[in-house]
């Protein structure tokens, strides 16, 4: 029962860490305050994802060997550095370094938080609750996002810098919450391994498990192919809405509505999966996402498909996370889960700057058109995987 507290503390951590007043307006901040071009912003995001790409697995090793708490704390300290650079530097090179720290912040958290929660449940014999717990975590995540998005529309209308200071304060609280968590004990054996054995166990064994297990590999690839286009659309949206004449407050309300519907999706994910099962979820939820991408191109109707994307994305995220965690052994969980972040970053490194360049030359509407085409091609790949029964367990 001592690990039960971890679940509640993780809910609290998810809340305070994601009351982030910069999450949807950092791009606008760089364009308006730092006077960067869309192409420069695309390069910065590419650096972020190159950092994620190169550091996902190493930071997963840190989590599995030295502790999931240690990894999460290192992530918060890295984000502190990123915030200070964004506040006090206008130099492109220095801000580029800041994005490296931002990438580190996400990779240290990626996999480690999920691994800590899943293994806490496993130690209590309640791992079957993970989808429900992860769904509730998604609700809290989106609720926090909705609060910060609605509020940030007002905050940045007062001062962009205020948004960074407020976010810094919530990250301090998040750090305290992590310190109160109890580490899972499966790490003790790993701590006693020699360096050579450790490297073999964490890199070679994790890689073998991910790439030899066809089901795990395809689920990881599919997750990246769905998440990257949605993230790209989301990050460029404030600039697109600005060009359509939306005020900062209206942007905040729209982004907040997106998060609110995402929270609903997270809450109902385990119920929908229980009713419709895996294949229907994997066939139809991504299909609805593809349709939403095409509807986003209609400027007068952009609100509805964007809000629905939040709903479908959360369902897919929660369900996919459960499918993947069922396969992965506890002792390499954070490392193996990091491959999902690695593949996501690989797709983002290509897509995000490419869409930024298209938008710079021909406008964001054209960029979104290309994004809709890319998403449709990804869905065709998913159909091929499903029709070939490549997700059958082995």
Sequence positions of predicted segments:
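Cytoplasmic helix-loop-helix junction between adjacent transmembrane helices
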Residues: 100-142
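Transmembrane alpha-helix termini and helix-breaking/packing motifs in multi-pass membrane transporters
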Residues: 32-33, 145-167, 243-244, 350-368
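Juxtamembrane intracellular "pre-TM" segments in multi-pass secondary transporters
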Residues: 1-4, 183-221
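Helix-to-loop junctions at the C-terminal end of transmembrane segments
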Residues: 54-67, 156, 264-278, 359-360
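C-terminal transmembrane helical hairpin of 12-TM major facilitator-type secondary transporters
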Residues: 279-320
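Helix-loop boundary and gating motifs at the non-cytosolic
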Residues: 2-54, 213-256
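C-terminal ends and interior cores of transmembrane alpha-helices
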Residues: 77-90, 287-299
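Helix-loop junctions on the cytosolic side of multi-pass membrane transporters
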Residues: 164-171, 175-194, 384-394
